[in-house]
Amino acid sequence: MTDERVERIKKMEAKLDDVTPKIKNFEESLSNMKKVFDDMKVLSDYYSKDWKSDYFADEEGKLPKNLKRGVLGQDTLYDLFQRYYDIGKDMKELSDKIKTLKKKILINKKINNLL
């Protein structure tokens, strides 16, 4: 049993070493996503208010030829919003799984504290 226990501990230690920096990276990514929200709101407001008139101004040749205009692509903003939404959906699904895991951990912690 001792060899089995040692192997189990080594395996769990390797998991801990693997997961710890990934959690830190995810925290940084999540912080960036929170900051991106404000920019996405600005882009959403632009898309619903001024985008169409800017698009037609470009179509009519009223904008400088050297102006960067990726934002005026018909699907550029929509596709970006869809990707952002999909990330949010994935985060919600992951959040639900994490909450379930947390409940299990809390139950186990209570049981282990009784020993």
Q: Language-model segments: which ranges?
A:
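Long, low-complexity or tandemly repetitive, helically biased scaffold regions used
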Residues: 2, 11, 17-115
